Amino acid sequence: MDWEHPENNVYHVTEEFTVSSWDRLRKIRPDVVLFINGIPFAVIECKSPTVDIQQAIEQTVRNQGTDYAPQLFKFAQIVLAVGMNEALYATCGTGKKFWGIWKEQDEAFMQQSLKKYVNGRLDTTQDRAIISLLSKERLLELTQFFIVYDGNIKKICRYQQYFAVKEIIKTINQNDIRCNRQGGVIWHTQGSGKSITMVMLAKFLLMKLAGQPKIVVVTDRKELDKQIAQTFA
């Protein structure tokens, strides 16, 4: 996989990709599967705008079960349920109630992409979600830096976490004439994924910044030390 030069990879998209269960008693046919270099990276279930999008989520969760085709989802990084005016995403193994929406914050990127891919008609929520999550550079970036394991649970970033990390990186890369950097504060509510955001940021810094960056984690309570250590482990 060429992470630095996405254009060097080979991309394929299939419709109704058929996968059999291990006992060949059942077959699944995801509506769309995206392959990169022959590896299934994204699986999409599409529904009519008149059908509850939860059906697409339930179908995708079911298809990952041992009685269906878990082998397809061993490699997939992103799963989507789309229905023209709705779109929800997750990663493999995510429970139904944890699927989320993506709100694109880089409007210049979105408008440029819409002009390129959606020309001559009004764009939809489905269009925006696919562009935000499955554009070549974005999909590889999400896979490399923004999917982590919390224990045995695979997690993908929320859009707030992604754009928070990107803003931090932007600030870190900006120096004044004396080579000083500005600090900053990322505001979080309780339970919004602060620790996971820190892990994603650390991963990005260690893999992308030149030299040997050092990361210092400071907590204000002793009980947080163990929690943070376990999260980073």
What residues fall within each predicted segment?
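ATP-dependent helicase/translocase motor core
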Residues: M1-K214, T219-A233
